[in-house]
Design a protein with these regions (language model features):
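A structural boundary/capping signal
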Residues: 1-190
């Protein structure tokens, strides 16, 4: 939030932090509700339950989603604008998921996938790749291969480097770089 406030230092970030806390609480409650309905303690079922809870709350109840229509709009990379508009870039939406997951003690990492930022959620030895831009859907190897080919051409194949974890700093830098690129395109930076 502090990075987003750089464009408007007088802007109060408290309502944004409060909203993130509310979303975190709702995800935590949804996990509890889904857990009570499920008797399966298998790690695979647990990770799917967590994914379902996040999908129900973040893109479901709060309606956060990718902005495919105005993808290059600078507002899609400004975290406060993303929260206001409920639309954003994959990396901006990923920050929301990461914050919520960490508040709920869920193991999640950003994945610096070529051309499209993703998330990896882990629980009980099971993993899921999540696309925050498209409603938090999970992507299997076939979908990841298709996504890679869309960005790198038909000859591209999945490599271990495509699953490279992005540090919190790398995620923030990627978001800031998106803002910079969009500002340059608009002629705001020389």
């Amino acid at each position: 939030m502090h990075f987003a406030r750089l464009n408007d230092p007088n802007r109060d970030i408290a309502p944004y932090i409060d909203l993130l806390e509310a979303i975190s609480g709702d995800v935590r409650n949804r996990i509890g509700s889904l857990s009570a309905q499920s008797r399966d303690e298998d790690g695979r079922a647990v990770v799917d339950l967590i994914v379902q809870a996040m999908q129900d709350v973040i893109p479901g109840h709060y309606q956060f989603q990718g902005d495919a229509e105005n993808y290059d709009d600078i507002a899609n990379a400004d975290l406060m604008s993303v929260i206001d508009r409920k639309r954003g870039l994959p990396v901006a939406l990923a920050l929301l998921y990461v914050h919520v997951a960490k508040r709920c003690q869920i193991e999640i990492t950003g994945i610096d996938f070529p051309g499209h930022f993703l998330l990896r959620l882990q629980s009980g030895g099971a993993r899921r790749m999540i696309d925050p831009f498209h409603g938090g859907i999970t992507l299997g190897s076939a979908e990841l291969r298709e996504l890679l080919k869309a960005f790198q051409g038909l000859d591209a194949e999945l490599q271990p480097a495509h699953y490279r974890e992005a540090s919190d700093i790398a995620i923030l830098l990627r978001l800031q770089n998106n803002i910079k690129v969009r500002a340059i395109r608009r002629g705001e930076l020389a």
